[in-house]
Amino acid sequence: MVRTINETFLKACRGERTDYVPAWYMRQAGRSQPEYRKIKEKYSLFEITHNPELCAYVTKLPVDQYNVDAAILYKDIMSPLPAIGVDVEIKSGIGPVIDNPIRSLQDVEKLGEINPEDDVPYILDTIRLLTTEMLDVPLIGFSGAPFTLASYMIEGGPSRNYHNTKAFMYAEPKAWFALMDKLADMVITYLKAQINAGAKAVQIFDSWVGTVNVADYRVFIKPAMERIFAEVRTMGVPMIMHGVGAPHLVNEWHDLPLDVVGLDWRLPIEEARARGVHKAVQGNMDPSFLLAPWSVIEEHVKGILDQGMKQPGYIFNLGHGVFPEVNPDTLKRLTTFIHEYSKGQLAK
């Protein structure tokens, strides 16, 4: 069965005019929701993501509660790594921990390839369930970017400064580029499978790329990103790039064959456009504002919307994920305000 969906988000991704500004929030499904916390009392992240019915419920929950214009698949960026031979465990209070960190070219050469239908069928089944039976808004598939995935694989877990990753990049360039190629292959195959299963857009998250300077990005990271976006582009769905703490890289992302440049709060939308970012833009509210009084939130959001609406192709989002402390009612009120305020302004 083919469902009719609200395409406002997709139109904005394509740079088309919309009647109002579409909105969704990174980590909209999860820790701030009482329903989710009850589920986590009984099930681990692994158990939720391996159960298509439960995972679909968690993914859809914020669509029902907040009236957002897109759903994003509930899963972890580390989900595909076991398929290529990475021993990863998500530890409470720590994050991803890898038992066999990459230390050499030989370690890279041991990595395998992903076959999504065999290796992550539960993810594809979740997408199919959501897009054929449950959602009336587009579903966003996603992947971690090669640099962020490589950082976990080299550091063995989260890091404050990623010294080991950058040292490996500088000291072992042959092994580094081999790792980038392996991860680019995995990301391409993984995203294409999500699109084939029903995802209507995809986003690549590069959580730690802000630690890299522009020159190093161009040499060590950008070639893999160019190949990913060029190959996935053939699937015909909008593609979004989002990095954290990387305002110095937005022009590098703009050069990639993608549709939407994601911004965090460190760079105002109008400044990004002044720098030459003319593709669709997504962002860029500091999630900390969600803990402020409503009057403060409203004025801040007006400012963001007024910048974003100056040209077609704008999607409201946060610059990072929703905090656990955020009141779900605030997110519901925020979506309503975004829709109503932007509709009034765009109708003028």
From Swiss-Prot:
Its main location: cytoplasm. One of its GO terms (molecular function) is uroporphyrinogen decarboxylase activity. It is found in: Cytoplasm. Pathway: Porphyrin-containing compound metabolism; protoporphyrin-IX biosynthesis; coproporphyrinogen-III from 5-aminolevulinate: step 4/4. The record marks D76 as: Transition state stabilizer. GO terms for cellular component: cytosol. Pfam families: URO-D. Belongs to the uroporphyrinogen decarboxylase family. Catalyzes the decarboxylation of four acetate groups of uroporphyrinogen-III to yield coproporphyrinogen-III. This is Uroporphyrinogen decarboxylase.
